[in-house]
Amino acid sequence: MTKKLKVAIVGSGNIGTDLMIKILRHGQHLEMGALVGIDPNSDGLARAARLGVATTAEGVEGLARLPGFGEIDFVFDATSAGAHVRNEAFLRALKPGLRLIDLTPAAIGPYCVPVVNLEQNLHETNVNMVTCGGQATIPMVAAVSRVARVHYAEIVASIASRSAGPGTRANIDEFTETTSKAIEAIGGARKGKAIIVLNPAEPPLIMRDTVYVLSAPADRARVEASLAEMAQAVQGYVPGYRLKQRVQFDEIPDAAPLNIPGLGRLSGLKTSVFLEVEGAAHYLPAYAGNLDIMTSAALATAERMAQSMLNA
């Protein structure tokens, strides 16, 4: 039997519970050790208990008191940006080599988008999964960056209001800041901007993302091929990720440049990418692709890290 590394998930809300179910069903190098929350009445903790997973409603302090804490190699943090800072400090003092996968916008460690830079971060002890909008759109920015220098990238993430729990709503400002920084840091844009829209439509619509990229002039066929290749790579761990329609291109001539705040007047090739992300519906409804892409990316990251650790 293949050895598996034990994980704890901190946060028993939508994301934490969905991630638990993914690990229970599909974990190859990982297995559940504990689900941690702060609300003893949460559905996530009740579900974990029914599935035979150890639980605590006393936060990371309760996790540290569980009999199996010594066997935990990975901790996924699905709380909030502020809570992650405290959780990281507490857990790191107890287990310096613990691997933390941060699903909040705290970004203590380097940003990680699996198809873009996972291999460079395999030995990090804390990686940040950016945001749902970042996981969906940064691969597209990086795909253009492989072909041409990207001056500016702007993303708009539209998610169903019903899929946005209290953690998501509390982190709106951090969402835009973290996503914008990651568009630059790993997407390759000189300047990035992120916008999130909570769509109140009923019945809820699946996650939709729009990516606008202004780059140096480039061969359109090469850009389109790079985008299609990247989308296929993301589908390797998020099957519901897809290009909604063909990529659109617009030439921005020198005579009529765009005025980008912070960069000035720029010309080049404008690339518009339209995406949708349908969730796998493990715990959350299919419209909650925004949450599914976060849990799927986090699981893909930890699985690859665990594989590397087990093969060392």
Swiss-Prot record:
It catalyses: acetaldehyde + NAD(+) + CoA = acetyl-CoA + NADH + H(+). Its EC number is 1.2.1.10. SUPFAM superfamilies: Glyceraldehyde-3-phosphate dehydrogenase-like, C-terminal domain, NAD(P)-binding Rossmann-fold domains. Coiled coil: none annotated. The active site is at 132 (acyl-thioester intermediate). Disulfide bonds: none annotated. CDD domains: ALDH_C (cd23933). Pfam families: AcetDehyd-dimer, Semialdhyde_dh. GO terms for molecular function: acetaldehyde dehydrogenase (acetylating) activity; NAD binding. It is an enzyme of class 1 (oxidoreductase). Keywords: Aromatic hydrocarbons catabolism, NAD, Oxidoreductase. One of its GO terms (biological process) is catabolic process. InterPro entries: Acetaldehyde_dehydrogenase (IPR003361), Acetylaldehyde_DH_C (IPR015426), NAD(P)-bd_dom_sf (IPR036291), Semialdehyde_DH_NAD-bd (IPR000534). NAD(+) binds at residues 12-15, 163-171, 290. HAMAP family: Ac_ald_DH_ac. Belongs to the acetaldehyde dehydrogenase family. This is Acetaldehyde dehydrogenase 4. The lineage of its organism: Bacteria, Pseudomonadati, Pseudomonadota, Gammaproteobacteria, Pseudomonadales.
